[in-house]
Amino acid sequence: MIVRAQHCCAPTGKPIMPYKITLLPGDGIGPEVIACAEQVLRVLPLEFEFTRAEIGFDAYERLGTPLPDATLQSIRSSHAALFGAVTTPPNLPGYFSPVVRMRQKLDLYANLRPIRSTPHPSSRPGIDLLIVRENTEGLYSGLERLEDDGNRAITERVITRKGSERIIRKAFDLARQTGRKKAHVVHKANVLRQTCGLFRAVALEIAREYPEIEMLEMLVDTCAMELVRAPEQFEVIVTTNLFGDILSDEACMFVGGLGVAASGNIGTAAAVFEPVHGSAPPLVGTGKANPTATFLATAMMLEHLGETEQASRLRNAVESCIAAGQVTPDLGGALTTDGMTRKVIGILG
């Protein structure tokens, strides 16, 4: 399906190629929030080609797999993808996490979680943090097994030099590009001496290449505590997969919660952007699904495409809605999902 926005030129008048975007609605409220993002993209002065692809539990029930090969191919052939949410039932034979598998198959090695203060009353001021999480190895490598007749469960933690080098370099590059002056390398090398030890050693090597950026290291338990005590002290955090997963969800609670948390999964040949929240089955069809995180993920996607002006416009429109209380009930407002979408579109003009 090809959807062309009203204008086919950028605001500068420079012609652009249509951006090929794969939409991954998924399960639960995923289709609802992705539909909202598509509506917003339609009103921007850009040109898009949208393709919908299957992912998640609904795909598994109909196709026998939660991540069809056709979905991976669609993402590979697109400039970027927008993902909604999936339902992952535990202990279902033949079912695997399509999100983890997608990250591995497409080598989406960097998970970027911007944590910024919002105009919401629950948001703490002065926070502008980027968490850079290794996205393809660690304890999420998928190497699990049962032994001793099911009485012992083992998960292998894989940390490689290559994986550590590229995620740490990505974090320091982003710090340099965004004018940040310090980066915290978070690990648990005092206990996990081999895996975190390698990650830490690589960080110390790479940090020498960025003399203008102060490298600080912090144990993960200390970091969790410091995020509660003084989150504004952090500018960039780079860490391994599981640690980053936990810390980023913790940090987003200081700026409004999961309803405003967006994420980017970046590789060398593909990029997938998503809201962090889950599929929220009880909210399906109620009009209460919060599209804010999906809008912010869409802004991240626009930045990735080089459309920084349109990304800023969208982000500012969302923040204007938050400041005015024109939001969904989970953020203290009274708007429906579609109602908030219309407000954002109205601001964008």
Model-predicted segments: where are they?
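N-terminal glycine-rich phosphate/adenylate-binding segment common to multiple enzyme folds
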Residues: 61-157, 242
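Buried hydrophobic positions in well-ordered alpha/beta secondary-structure cores of metabolic enzymes
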Residues: 27-30, 79, 132, 171, ...
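Extreme N-terminal starter segment of soluble prokaryotic enzymes
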Residues: 17-21
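Flexible, glycine/charged-enriched surface loops at secondary-structure junctions
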Residues: 49, 178-187, 210-218, 307-315, ...
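Glycine-rich phosphate/nucleotide-binding loop
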Residues: 59-60, 108, 226-326
